[in-house]
Amino acid sequence: MTSAPNASGIRPDIHFAVQASAVDAHLFDVQLHIAQPAAQQLLSLPVWIPGSYLVREFSKNLQGLKATQNGQPVAVQQLSKNQWKIACNADADCVISYQVCAYDTSVRTAWLDRRRGFFNGTSLCLRVHGQEERPHALELLGSPATQDWQVATGLTPAQIDANGFGLYTAAHYDELVDCPVEMGRFWRGSFVAGGVPHEFVVAGAAPSFDGERLLADTKKICEAEIAFWHADGSQPPMDRYVFMLNVVDDNYGGLEHRNSTALICGRRDLPRKGEAKAGEGYNTLLGLISHEYFHTWNVKRLRPAELASYDYEQENYTELLWFFEGFTSYYDDLFLRRAGLLDNSQYLKLVTRTINQVLQTPGRLVQSVAEASFDAWVKYYRQDENTANHTVSYYTKGSLVALCLDLALRAHGKSNLDDVMRGLWRCSEGGPISEADVLAVVSEAGNPEIAGQLQAWVHSTEDLPLRELLARHGIKSRAEPAQLAQKLGLRVQENHSVQIKTVLRGGAAEQAGMMAGDEWLAVEADGQRWRISKLDDVQLYAAGSNQLTAWVARDQQILQLTLNPGGLLAKAASEDADSASPISNLGLEISDKAAAERWLTGIAA
């Protein structure tokens, strides 16, 4: 693999050349040219990617690292799992060659096959220690396997061909690895929002895909969010923006970047030509688009002070993910409502789902949302059978904290959460912030009492005053009948049998001795034994029984467990929720349309 200098004949100080030639082996070939290496040049590959808080050990996919100077081999010493030292002549260019296996379809790493290639710089581009702030370049080289492919990336093009292969530049290493690259045969569309050119590429869509609808709806989201952050007429922080969507049979997720986002969704989630009304999957996709785009401001510019400068070698801890992910989660669906893509009923259904997810998580009473933020590295991204019992999602509970703060500020009559977000943007000049900064702006926008409430919501495990605050803004709460799994304290998977995935703390299933991994085979009630294949069968065969026997399979043994549902199998009716009684399943409806409209449409308090 040989790369060429740019048109000026001058190669940037740090130059990467990437080629997708061995597509059937899923291998990217990479060459790193260092114009002025140190005598003992250190190199490392990040262990994590910003925005996804888990040590992922990207170096496990790197192989065959070699170094040369003037065509001659140079000694390479591996110092750790992700670090190498090159014994260089500091007066000559150093060329490092290696391959990276790309076999992860997620948005976090890299993928390569005959159809498409994708990578984040954190998976392919070594960090040249001591030279991170120097200009970097990425050259994408074509190959016989990629001759009809196109390229999409947020990197600045310097010298590229019609398909996008060629030379791109970045001001420094952080910028280089914050601009993922999509390659392949894909659908491409564009629009302008807030004066900023936007591009949308979609790989893997079915022929029925309605690209024009996706573009039109995405444009509405972008225009609404730009208007939100730049109500004062200031310019957005990016010159252009790229959406990269990988469409597969069944997956979902996204990762934010400074002027782009990588997304993944299921084919059935896309809008279809001739379809008058898209399904819930499409609304979920629009929520994802809204979420990642909002991160352009809230995470990529506004960010935790602890992450002002990334340490790519280890975990970067912060207690503020409730703000950066949770508040973004509050606004993602809210902007679908403000942009006219959801009606009030659809939006409240999404809010209801979030509330119930939190209320049905025993871990909310064990760990605060600030603690959950700090523990993201070992808990949120490493979920297991006990996760629901000992932690809470900083996405979902964080979004409810944002909801409560917005409603509390509006009830106070002076401001709202929109003012807080824009105030933080102004006072930080779109840079790092601390919790103290958030509290100070809340105090200024509302009063110190509301700031104190926010601090308590974030650092305690008390339930949030959701019903009281919603009621003050025209939203009535009602207690909804719980599903059987919720009544029993179970989370299950049904596939011709009942597989127990989680046993929730304090529930009837835990008291009976059930555990994650059990297969629930049968129930015995009133002297009759019944085989079950789905959880509803329990209610079918044992309704009205105050005690029943559950037969479960565990480690090839059949166990007999006594379950005391205590009338939980009986059907229940909905009832109004008063603010004093604990509720684990909530429904919402509008009781005062004018008050609700002021909140849902973003009218100032």
What are these regions (language model features)?
Residues 37-67:
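N-terminal, post-signal-peptide region of Sec/Tat-exported proteins
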